[in-house]
C-alpha cells in the first residue's frame, strides 16, 4: 500500500488546477497550517464529507516498561483524534469490498 504525501497532493493541484508548483506546495502547507492552528487553539476541525479532528484529554494511567516489566506511570496528555465522516466511511467500505 502506497502513502499519499504532501508532495503528491501538491503535484495533483499542479496538474489538475494549473497552479504552478510553488503555489501548489504553498496551498497544501496553508491547508495543514490551518488545521494545526485550529487544533492548537482547542478548536474542532470539521471537514464536510471527510471527517472531524478533535482533541481529547487522556488521564494519567499505569503502564509497564516492556523490557524490564517495571510499572511506570504514563502521564496525562492531550491527543488528536480523527472520526471519519459517513461519505469517507462509505468510500472506504466500497473500496475494501473490491479488494477481496
UniProtKB/Swiss-Prot annotation:
The gene is ihfA. Heterodimer of an alpha and a beta chain. GO terms for biological process: DNA recombination; positive regulation of metabolic process; regulation of DNA-templated transcription; regulation of translation. SMART domains: BHL (SM00411). This is Integration host factor subunit alpha. Keywords: DNA recombination, DNA-binding, Transcription, Transcription regulation, Translation regulation. This protein is one of the two subunits of integration host factor, a specific DNA-binding protein that functions in genetic recombination as well as in transcriptional and translational control. GO terms for cellular component: cytosol. Residues 53-72 are annotated as: Disordered. SUPFAM superfamilies: IHF-like DNA-binding proteins (SSF47729). NCBIfam families: himA (TIGR00987), PRK00285.1 (NF001401). It comes from the Bacteria. GO terms for molecular function: DNA binding; structural constituent of chromatin. Belongs to the bacterial histone-like protein family. InterPro entries: Hist_DNA-bd, Histone-like_DNA-bd_CS, IHF-like_DNA-bd_dom_sf, IHF_alpha.
Amino acid at each position: 500500500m502506497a502513502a499519499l504525501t504532501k508532495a503528491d497532493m501538491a503535484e495533483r493541484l499542479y496538474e489538475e488546477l494549473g497552479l504552478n508548483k510553488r503555489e501548489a506546495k504553498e496551498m497544501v502547507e496553508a491547508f495543514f497550517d490551518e488545521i494545526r492552528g485550529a487544533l492548537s487553539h482547542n478548536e474542532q476541525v470539521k471537514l464536510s464529507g471527510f471527517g472531524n479532528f478533535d482533541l481529547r484529554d487522556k488521564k494519567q494511567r499505569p503502564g509497564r516498561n516492556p523490557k524490564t516489566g517495571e510499572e511506570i506511570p504514563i502521564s496525562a496528555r492531550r491527543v488528536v483524534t480523527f472520526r471519519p465522516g459517513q461519505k469517507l466511511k462509505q468510500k472506504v467500505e466500497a473500496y475494501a469490498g473490491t479488494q477481496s
